[in-house]
């Protein structure tokens, strides 16, 4: 069975279902509420497990009640959380998420700066990559030092090293991005990184700077990547979107799993696109992430 090591953030999402997203600074009322686990790498790990892979989550949480909620949920989905570190005196990440009736979302996140940024403790954890096949690494950018350590180790071992590149308040650090074998941007992040809204030009800029495979996700428009000098496109799967929260994380997780299984890029992109679309087609947080059989039936 293929495996993906996912490193990055896990947060507790407080999700409010609303008719429309707020436009004014007054009191607003939600139609529904739920608290669910979120975070790029953590949700990607759940997607890997749901799609039939072995999933490991590596991250940092505060030593607080929210951490136990998050770890229990991940464990319930079959994710190995034994390599996650709890930090005394720090708070686990939390987000307020507003979702409108079209599935579009607004997110306010808090990440405690007291979470330990030193990745030295990872060296023993990352030995699981050595001498392995059918395994890939996936990291988000919310813990850059950890992402650099994981991706560099995977790349050195000749394994797929996938970086989830989303909008980042701290900007981008090329020394981290260059550790990836596969740099997968969100559409806004690619524009921010390359300084142009011409996405074909932006991909060429990114590839020249990073010297690796580059692509980006664009929601319902699908996903795009460079194949030599050619721009390739995986169209979005037509669905009625009701909840887009975590769709990009599902895409990244299942894309990394596809690479770990040895799929060629077009097939891995199709696999990930179907998984992300199915997730958007239903409400329910991580329970809405599709199983392997559901993905294959749609494929």
Language model segments and positions:
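Hydrophobic packing within well-folded, soluble alpha/beta domains
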Residues: 48, 57, 74, 96, ...
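Short, basic and Ser/Thr-rich N-terminal targeting/leader segments
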Residues: 51, 90-93, 219
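Ribokinase/PfkB-type carbohydrate-kinase core domain
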Residues: 1-10, 73-86, 98-232
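Conserved phosphate-binding/catalytic region of the ribokinase-like
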Residues: 1-4, 199-299
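Residues at secondary-structure transition points
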Residues: 28-39, 43, 65, 87-91, ...
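Glycine-rich phosphate/adenosyl-contacting loop at the front of the ribokinase-like
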Residues: 1-60, 65-69, 76
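Gly/Ala-rich phosphate-binding loop of Rossmann-like dinucleotide-binding domains
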Residues: 49, 155, 260
């Amino acid at each position: 069975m293929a495996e993906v090591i996912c490193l990055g953030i896990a947060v507790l999402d407080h999700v409010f279902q609303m008719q429309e997203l707020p436009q004014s600074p007054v009191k607003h009322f939600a139609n529904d509420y739920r608290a669910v686990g979120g975070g790029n790498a953590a949700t990607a790990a759940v997607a890997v497990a749901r799609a039939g892979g072995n999933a490991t989550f590596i991250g940092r949480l505060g030593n607080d009640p929210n951490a136990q909620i998050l770890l229990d949920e991940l464990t319930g989905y079959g994710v190995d959380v034994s390599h996650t570190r709890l930090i005394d005196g720090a708070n686990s990440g939390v987000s307020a998420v507003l979702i409108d009736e079209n599935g579009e979302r607004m997110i306010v996140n808090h990440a405690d700066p007291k979470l330990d940024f030193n990745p030295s403790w990872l060296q023993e954890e990352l030995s699981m990559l050595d001498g392995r096949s059918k395994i890939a690494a996936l990291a988000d950018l919310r813990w850059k030092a950890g992402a650099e350590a994981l991706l560099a180790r995977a790349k050195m071992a000749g394994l797929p090293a996938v970086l989830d590149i989303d909008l980042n308040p701290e900007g981008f650090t090329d020394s981290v991005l260059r550790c990836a074998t596969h740099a997968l941007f969100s559409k806004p992040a690619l524009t921010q990184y390359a300084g142009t809204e011409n996405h074909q030009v932006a991909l060429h800029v990114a590839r020249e700077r990073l010297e690796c495979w580059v692509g980006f996700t664009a929601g319902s428009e699908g996903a795009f990547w460079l194949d030599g000098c050619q721009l390739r496109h995986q169209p979005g799967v037509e669905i009625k979107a009701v909840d887009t929260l975590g769709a990009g994380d599902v895409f990244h997780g299942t894309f990394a799993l596809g690479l770990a299984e040895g799929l060629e890029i077009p097939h891995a992109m199709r696999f990930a696109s179907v998984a992300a679309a199915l997730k958007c087609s239903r409400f329910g947080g991580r329970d809405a992430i599709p199983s392997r059989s559901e993905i294959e039936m749609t494929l």
